[in-house]
Swiss-Prot record:
Organism: Citrobacter koseri (strain ATCC BAA-895 / CDC 4225-83 / SGSC4696)
Keyword Amino-acid biosynthesis: no
PANTHER family documented for this protein: ANTITERMINATION NUSB DOMAIN-CONTAINING PROTEIN (PTHR11078:SF3), N UTILIZATION SUBSTANCE PROTEIN B-RELATED (PTHR11078)
GO molecular function, one term: RNA binding
Encoding gene per record: nusB
Task performed by this protein: Involved in transcription antitermination. Required for transcription of ribosomal RNA (rRNA) genes. Binds specifically to the boxA antiterminator sequence of the ribosomal RNA (rrn) operons.
UniProt name for this protein: Transcription antitermination protein NusB
Taxonomic lineage of the native organism: Bacteria, Pseudomonadati, Pseudomonadota, Gammaproteobacteria, Enterobacterales
Length: 139
């Protein structure tokens, strides 16, 4: 699958996870509704599904990975920033095939696209500290 299709999968995952985090609906229902309502012809749908289920299943673990590096309480994080960080931390901790720099750079781009004005700086700061702990060899 093309890198652009992976990027689109991440973009869709941010949107779907944002909805899930706010609604607390079952992740399978969120996925079904998202895929029914969105044009996903240029999306790596399998990767989108993996990101959604992986983040939802591991959300407490992923939150634990980010907490030591947050400058504020987890509960005070914006929902977009939380979704972006969860995706990046999922890729860093559970998907060793995703290069270290790709996971971080994609997260920064997602934060620029969907987040508040300076959220990409916040996301970069958290990942800059967390990533070397998760992947000490930076691969």
């Amino acid at each position: 699958m093309k890198p652009a299709a992976r990027r689109r999968a991440r973009e869709c995952a941010v949107q779907a996870l944002y909805s899930w985090q706010l609604s607390q609906n079952d992740i399978a229902d969120v996925e079904y509704q998202f895929l029914a309502e969105q044009d996903v012809k240029d999306v790596d749908v399998l990767y989108f599904r993996e990101l959604l289920s992986g983040v939802a299943t591991n959300s407490a673990y992923l939150d634990g990975l980010m907490k030591p590096y947050l400058s504020r309480l987890l509960e005070e994080l914006g929902q977009v920033e939380k979704a972006v960080l969860r995706i990046a931390l999922f890729e860093l901790s559970k998907r060793s095939d995703v290069p270290y720099k790709v996971a971080i750079n994609e997260a920064i781009e997602l934060a620029k696209t969907f987040g508040a004005e300076d959220s990409h700086k916040f996301v970069n700061g958290v990942l800059d500290k967390a990533a070397p702990v998760i992947r000490p060899n930076k691969k």
